[in-house]
Amino acid sequence: MVKRSAFHPATALLFSVLLTATVQAAVLPGNPVISRRAAAESMALLKNRNSTLPLIPADRVAAFGHGAVDFIGGGWGSGHVKTEYNANLNEALERQAEAGRIRYCPEAADAWGGDSKFRPDAAFVNHIRKQADTAVLVISRCSGESKDRSPGAGDWLLTVEEQELLQLLKKAKFRKLIVVLNTAGPVSTSELTDDAVDAILYASLPGMEGAHAAADLLTGTINPSGKLTDTWAVAYEDYPSSKDFIRTADFQEYEEDIFVGYRYFSTFDKEKHKVNFPFGHGLSYTMFEIAAPALSHENDTLVFRVPVTNIGDRSGREVVQLYVSAPQGKLGKPAMELAAFGKTRDLSPGERQELTLRVPLAQLASFDDTGRSGHEGCRVLEAGDYRFFPGNSSWDAIMHSPVLFRQEKLQIIFRASVRLKPSLLPRRLTADGSREALPVIRATAEKTVEIPHDRAIEIEAENFTAAHPNTGIEKFGNQGRRELRCVSRMDHRGRFVEYTLTVRQPGRYAIRFRVSNGRPALQDIMTCEVNGIAQPLRLDVPSTGNGPVRGEWYNFITLAPVTMKLPRGEVKLKLISNGTFINLDSFTIAPAQQSDVLFAAFDREHSRIPLPGFHKRERRFPPNGKIVYGTLRRYPEQLDAFLEQMSDDDLAQLLGGHAGSSHGSAGSLGACDVFEIPPYDTFDGPSGVRSFDSCTSWPCPALLAGSFDPELAETIGAALAREARLNRFDIWLAPGVNIHRNPLCGRNFEYLSEDPLLSGQMGAALARGAASENIAVTVKHFAANNREHRRFQTDSRISERALRDIYLRPFEIIVKEARPLFLMSSYNLLNGRKTAETPELLTGILRDEWKFTGTILSDWGNNSDHVYETLAGNTVKMERGNPAALLEAMRHGELTRGHLKRAAGYLVKSLLQVQLMREKQIKPAPDILPSPPEAGKLK
């Protein structure tokens, strides 16, 4: 038996171990059945020319492509799930043939089974054509953590081999040519839109049973009802974010602003020239009539009742998508925005259902970040006519007659308590197609520094008077009330900073730089120019590494001095990067002849002295004895006393993660034996329990969102949670709700959609489902984590409006609707600051505005500083903390014991709720109808 806690005997019964069997990862019975059904409910039928599908018993089917025998169930990285099997389409079609739904020729797919590099020629294809009249071509693409997708062949585009095979299949004139896209996200479909290709099924990364689900749809055993959660453009270059997504720069300029995905195309591509398949698109084998909604009001919510009738000859489900076209007002709006959605039950031919869709008025408001409405820093509902269009896709909706709601006057919905304005985003797209210039703060106010002849003087690196436009200023801490900043992002030859000096006494001066270098040692990092003349000096920088107090990027050291000549009068000192650079905090200048003495005097005057009288707190147990963790269950009001008895060391240790105690754990929280806090284990991933042994692989979240069915998402969340509990886990590191800004983000399959409402509501449903089966969730990655390339360094430069209306919106929905216990900050920078070190984001918005009371985890192994994380409101540093840095910061007054207690309080309250979950019995799986073809829809 694996021991999960070290409780005092008096509290052992209170915190009894849930399971006594040996820990062993396992697939919960029934979960593969749910996985298959969920995949089928989520896949989207993109094209079905002349009712090619569903296949019929007379169809003689052959499958082509390596993907037919190596069907991809999920991505790599945190999204990878080890499974007992991963069904492929070859075997799935064979099962359909055994059931009499088709006739199947396995010879084609078998050719790839024996040789993954098999390259068929015309003779092979024609040979198969004699046996089969229906060709199913499978195109597979994977994706994963730490690497983005490519716009080239083999990813967005077809490979040469795939193009050749497609042409061979077209020339062979199969009666039916069907393409199954087993891909991590959108790919180019321009070669598939001609009449030679009869049908396209988007299967995405559908989990271990996904191939069977695809076969169920191809044969009509299940009627497709999934929809696209992203816009599929004609060319990659048609996406507005494509111009800077794949470049190597350490920043992304979100110049498209709020016009992400279909918001962009509906506004600027009204002729529909740039889109092959729109957001929300997905066909059915039957037909539905969506009638005009009836509108009513309930307090501050608009209520739409939408009648839906199956007017076809097959049973099926339909998604009603309600879009709003808001008045342009003074702020400008996208042409269309998803306002609500709902999915019918399985409707028989002729059957009718009325869906009720609710739209809070607050949801229609826009954030005014520049004051155009007269209310800067507020979310406002502008006056005018709001037109609502129901439909089954973003294109279909606009064909329906609108329902009008009139807002008589501007209404302030919300006033922001903090601001997150960008400093380096020069412009943004507006609704009329023009670019609005934004204030760019490239340097501090121009300042001339006078160089004395009798002492040393320090110049802060950020006090430059000119700089390369991509040079950054990065906050790395506080000293009292003063923010500490450094110059960063000069890792390209030619980037520079320039300082204006006034020199009264010309001559040779010594200059020493205070730098941090998290890389291996660097040689000759910069060229120094004085009034345009390069100085004969060389600056080498050792690796500063991870110091006892600061992380690798802020562990500043002072280099040995170098010398240069400075003339009398105004001097322009220019520091030019020779390539790979460092973080530059400051530099000190003194006359060279006396530099040793003057630098020593400067150091004595500015030395970092511990607070007078500071003593590290040791443990102080109350008179009635030690309060242990279990006591808090009955007496939660003792939380402050519980924390107060801890030493500073205890608190610092508690604010870092620990090794996991379960098989395959990503790491644990708690684990303080002295106070009997057990370890609580976290686990990846978004598509299933990521363990060392086999578990269920589910449809990836991006596919699951295509179901447009929150009830189904709750079912998946609950089923996954039951399996996680069986495998002795506590905290799920999901859902991820970052927006699909660009189709090539490597982790898009882990996230949900390009739309914030769909992402938020489906993410909230997953969270509710998991919580219903006593697994806590961790919403991630907060925020704007939309690229994997150089993910530790990349800076997402976003306007405050786009941030609040698009990129933060899914997190806000989940925090308010599902009340998760945990949230994870992201690796990236947001408007020049690391998210885990940004108090405006973690405390101002998340806690103060949204009232989040849970625990904020850093992402695993990030390069943020633990001290500044704690000051910002990040609760626990994963997967390991830096307690020495926290204690050192307390010695020097940067942190107080109160900071540590506050963070520990959030953590302990969260863990107590996890403990309550842990103690509850694992519920048996609910009655689940067997997988098709044996049964109807999942309940």
Show which residues each predicted segment covers.
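Extracytoplasmic
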Residues: R442-R608
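Short amphipathic beta-strand/extended segments with alternating polar/hydrophobic composition
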Residues: G342, M399-Q407, L537-V541
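Bacterial N-terminal signal peptides
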Residues: T11-A21
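Glycoside hydrolase catalytic-domain context in secreted enzymes
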Residues: M1-F7, A21-P390, S394, L425-P452, ...
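Short, surface-exposed linear segments at secondary-structure transitions and domain or protein termini
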Residues: D238-S241, D346-E351, K409-S417, T544-W553, ...
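Short beta-strand elements
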Residues: D396-V418
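Sterically constrained small-residue positions within well-ordered secondary structures
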Residues: S16, E253, H281, H297, ...
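Intrinsically disordered, low-complexity regions enriched in serine, threonine, proline
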Residues: M1, I412, N478-R482
